[in-house]
């Protein structure tokens, strides 16, 4: 159903036999099952009393769920209340729920009685018999309510199949004789698929379709056909339509068969319209002349056309439609929706929001004012005491007004020149506000009043009302304290003059050329020196990078390869590097050096003893390279050990260990123990 009434959520109602089996089985499963006569009598009594209480609580919960989930006739919308009365019989429905409630109270009483009797049982056998009697009596009550359980289950099934009707939303209701085209109309304007047959009473229940008009959601209700007979003679099918017309605030579409193929004449259809017309009160009503594809309104005899014209004179629109050719269908739908929208908007405008009962009563009270009979003034007599109270009340209201409204206060209080105001008026100023008439002599004047009197001459003084031992200290300068220090102790009173002296000295130094550079960088010699210095710096950077790369490579491959590496120093490299640095080397000297370098050594090498070669330099472990010193590494090791405590406590191998151990060993949870004498109980 809607958000208010969702009858589909009602739990299934078991029959008496099923409920008995369920509760007894649950009692046997959820309570202990082994007791021995060797136990103390208190333990035996508690064993059987627990079973009685458990069954009582289980039945209490089941019956309470049934009672609370079914809707109460007095609490739901009148439309659903009357519809349930028509479909299920209000008295039968209430009696069934009442029997459930009575059974619940009787079961509670039986349980209390037998738990009390259990205290006087002196053996296991007597306790068992009391438990058996208690369970038997409680289950016997369920068997006696067999018909009520079956009836409530049928009601639940039918309620869950009812259409989703929202009594508060925008609604169109189709009504009329059977077989006049109501179901065909709802199939055309909505996506509903109502069965359409050429015989009467094809529709035996309410059907709902939904449409969108002007970006709003509308529901269209197809009602069963209504026959022209007294209300007490109508059957259940017809009363569903009457209930919808009586309780739903909707636009009514009375469908008529102008071709008279529904075995009803125009006069009979209009007579039905007049008989159910009281149900259309305060609702927009439209008449749809259906089946105009067979017979138009203009083809009607004069006496029948006159009857329709009489309805139009009464303000009831009549629109010709044909559900076969779609003629006039959308026009009738739009006209009905527009009239209902206009009525809802007008009702919202005229409605007044009433918050409490007093406003509700005062809204209906008419106050009469007597007309004057002559020109004589008959003023009311006000006692002096009452006048003083009124003045005091005005003063309080004025003070509250000043606190809330601020500048608007001057426009809402009486204007009268005070002492200062009179002086200003004498000097040609404007009249100011005085509240002297609204207060007594002992009341202190507010700053707001003084401000209104003095206007632009007012200066706010918050220190004049300070209550100090020495009144002369009111206007002393309060020291500014920051973190326990007086800021005045850190301020040099002559700092401004000292700053001016420093600025003056700087100006004199600038004028004397103290900050001018002695190096003239415009001559050619200076430019050459700067260029050479730049080249030297770049060369140093390259050598530094080259050395770092070679050192890193040597550290990886070890000293064995380093010892057999080819000598990279040569005369050409030396000459190029010295030339780049601007050193002039004689060509002859370079040739002599080259010759000496290339001269091979003659003779055998002298065999001399040598010490053990250095081992290859092994790189440090990666987990140690990340730390700058040993202290940092020790701190990280401590944190790692602390983080692993939880894993060790849970016996996990590491952070990725997600193994779930067997929490239910089969030998402990199988049906029987291995010796064949005892079961799992």
From Swiss-Prot:
<keyword id="KW-0690">Ribosome biogenesis</keyword>
<dbReference type="GO" id="GO:0003723">
    <property type="term" value="F:RNA binding"/>
</dbReference>
<feature type="binding site">
    <location>
        <begin position="222"/>
        <end position="226"/>
    </location>
    <ligand>
        <name>GTP</name>
    </ligand>
</feature>
<dbReference type="Pfam" id="PF06858">
    <property type="entry name" value="NOG1"/>
</dbReference>
<feature type="binding site">
    <location>
        <begin position="176"/>
        <end position="183"/>
    </location>
    <ligand>
        <name>GTP</name>
    </ligand>
</feature>
<dbReference type="InterPro" id="IPR012973">
    <property type="entry name" value="NOG_C"/>
</dbReference>
<dbReference type="InterPro" id="IPR006073">
    <property type="entry name" value="GTP-bd"/>
</dbReference>
<dbReference type="InterPro" id="IPR041623">
    <property type="entry name" value="NOG1_N"/>
</dbReference>
<dbReference type="GO" id="GO:0005634">
    <property type="term" value="C:nucleus"/>
</dbReference>
<dbReference type="Pfam" id="PF08155">
    <property type="entry name" value="NOGCT"/>
</dbReference>
<dbReference type="InterPro" id="IPR027417">
    <property type="entry name" value="P-loop_NTPase"/>
</dbReference>
<keyword id="KW-0547">Nucleotide-binding</keyword>
<keyword id="KW-0342">GTP-binding</keyword>
<keyword id="KW-0539">Nucleus</keyword>
<dbReference type="InterPro" id="IPR031167">
    <property type="entry name" value="G_OBG"/>
</dbReference>
<dbReference type="GO" id="GO:2000241">
    <property type="term" value="P:regulation of reproductive process"/>
</dbReference>
<dbReference type="GO" id="GO:0010888">
    <property type="term" value="P:negative regulation of lipid storage"/>
</dbReference>
<dbReference type="InterPro" id="IPR010674">
    <property type="entry name" value="NOG1_Rossman_fold_dom"/>
</dbReference>
<dbReference type="GO" id="GO:0005730">
    <property type="term" value="C:nucleolus"/>
</dbReference>
<dbReference type="InterPro" id="IPR024926">
    <property type="entry name" value="NOG1"/>
</dbReference>
<comment type="similarity">
    <text>Belongs to the TRAFAC class OBG-HflX-like GTPase superfamily. OBG GTPase family. NOG subfamily.</text>
</comment>
<dbReference type="Pfam" id="PF17835">
    <property type="entry name" value="NOG1_N"/>
</dbReference>
<feature type="domain" description="OBG-type G">
    <location>
        <begin position="170"/>
        <end position="341"/>
    </location>
</feature>
<dbReference type="GO" id="GO:0042273">
    <property type="term" value="P:ribosomal large subunit biogenesis"/>
</dbReference>
<comment type="function">
    <text>Involved in the biogenesis of the 60S ribosomal subunit. Has a role in regulating longevity, growth and brood size. May regulate fat storage via the insulin/IGF pathway.</text>
</comment>
<dbReference type="InterPro" id="IPR005225">
    <property type="entry name" value="Small_GTP-bd"/>
</dbReference>
<protein>
    <recommendedName>
        <fullName>Nucleolar GTP-binding protein 1</fullName>
    </recommendedName>
</protein>
<feature type="binding site">
    <location>
        <begin position="290"/>
        <end position="293"/>
    </location>
    <ligand>
        <name>GTP</name>
    </ligand>
</feature>
<dbReference type="GO" id="GO:0005525">
    <property type="term" value="F:GTP binding"/>
</dbReference>
<dbReference type="GO" id="GO:0003924">
    <property type="term" value="F:GTPase activity"/>
</dbReference>
<dbReference type="GO" id="GO:0008340">
    <property type="term" value="P:determination of adult lifespan"/>
</dbReference>
């Amino acid at each position: 159903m809607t958000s208010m009434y969702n009858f589909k959520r009602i739990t299934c109602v078991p029959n008496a036999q099923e409920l008995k089996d369920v509760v007894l089985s649950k009692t046997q499963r959820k309570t202990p099952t082994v007791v021995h006569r060797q136990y103390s009598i208190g333990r035996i009594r508690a064993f059987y009393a627990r079973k009685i209480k458990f069954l009582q609580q289980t039945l209490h919960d089941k019956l309470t769920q049934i009672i609370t989930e079914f809707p109460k006739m007095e609490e739901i919308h009148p439309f659903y209340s009357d519809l349930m009365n028509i479909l299920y019989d209000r008295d039968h429905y209430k009696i069934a729920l009442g029997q459930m409630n009575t059974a619940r109270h009787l079961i509670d009483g039986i349980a209390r009685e037998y738990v009390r009797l259990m205290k006087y049982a002196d053996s296991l056998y007597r306790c068992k018999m009391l438990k058996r009697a208690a369970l038997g009596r409680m289950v016997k009550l369920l068997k006696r309510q067999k018909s009520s359980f079956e009836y409530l289950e049928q009601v639940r099934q039918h309620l869950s199949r009812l259409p989703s009707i929202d009594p508060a939303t925008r609604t169109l209701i189709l009504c009329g004789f059977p077989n006049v085209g109501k179901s065909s109309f709802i199939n055309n304007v909505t996506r509903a698929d109502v069965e359409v047959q050429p015989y009467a009473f094809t529709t035996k229940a309410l059907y709902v379709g939904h449409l969108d008009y002007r970006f709003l959601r509308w529901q269209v209700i197809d009602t069963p056909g209504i026959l022209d007979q007294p209300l007490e003679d109508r059957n259940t099918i017809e009363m569903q339509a009457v209930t919808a017309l009586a309780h739903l605030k909707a636009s009514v579409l009375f469908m008529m068969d102008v071709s008279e193929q529904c075995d009803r004449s125009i006069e009979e259809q209009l007579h039905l319209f007049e008989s159910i017309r009281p149900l259309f009160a305060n609702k927009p009503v439209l008449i749809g002349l259906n089946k105009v594809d067979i017979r138009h309104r203009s083809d009607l005899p004069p006496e029948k056309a006159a009857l329709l014209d009489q309805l139009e004179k009464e303000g009831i629109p009549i629109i010709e439609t044909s559900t076969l050719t779609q003629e006039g269908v959308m026009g009738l739908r739009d006209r009905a929706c527009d009239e209902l929208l206009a009525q809802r908007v007008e009702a919202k405008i005229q409605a007044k929001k009433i918050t409490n009962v007093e406003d509700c009563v005062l809204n209906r009270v008419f106050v009469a004012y007597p007309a004057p009979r002559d020109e004589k003034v008959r003023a009311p007599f006000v006692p002096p005491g009452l006048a003083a109270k009124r003045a005091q009340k005005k003063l309080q209201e004025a003070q509250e007004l000043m606190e809330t409204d601020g500048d608007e206060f001057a426009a809402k209080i009486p204007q009268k020149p005070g002492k200062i105001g009179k002086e200003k008026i004498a000097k040609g100023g404007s009249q100011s506000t005085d509240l002297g008439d609204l207060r007594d002599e002992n009341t202190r004047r507010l700053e707001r009043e003084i401000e209104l009197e003095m206007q632009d001459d007012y200066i706010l003084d918050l220190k004049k009302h300070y209550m100090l031992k020495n009144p002369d200290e009111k206007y002393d300068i309060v020291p500014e304290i920051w973190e326990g220090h007086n800021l005045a102790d850190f301020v040099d009173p002559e700092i401004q003059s000292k700053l001016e002296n420093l600025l003056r000295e700087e100006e004199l130094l600038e004028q004397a050329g103290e900050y001018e550079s002695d190096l003239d960088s415009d001559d050619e010699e200076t430019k050459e020196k700067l260029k050479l210095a730049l080249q030297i710096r770049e060369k140093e950077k390259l050598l530094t990078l080259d050395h770092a790369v070679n050192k890193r490579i040597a550290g990886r491959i070890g000293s064995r390869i380093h010892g057999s590496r080819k000598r990279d120093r040569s005369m050409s490299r030396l000459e190029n590097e010295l030339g780049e640095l601007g050193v002039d080397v004689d060509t002859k000297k370079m040739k002599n050096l080259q010759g000496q370098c290339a001269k091979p050594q003659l003779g055998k090498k002298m065999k001399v003893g040598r010490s053990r070669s250095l081992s290859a330099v092994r790189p440090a472990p990666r987990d140690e390279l990340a730390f700058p010193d040993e202290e940092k590494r020790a701190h990280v090791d401590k944190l790692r050990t602390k983080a692993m405590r939880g894993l060790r406590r849970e016996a996990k191998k590491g952070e990725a260990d997600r193994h779930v151990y067997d929490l239910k060993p089969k030998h402990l949870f199988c049906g029987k123990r291995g010796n064949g004498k005892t079961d799992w109980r």
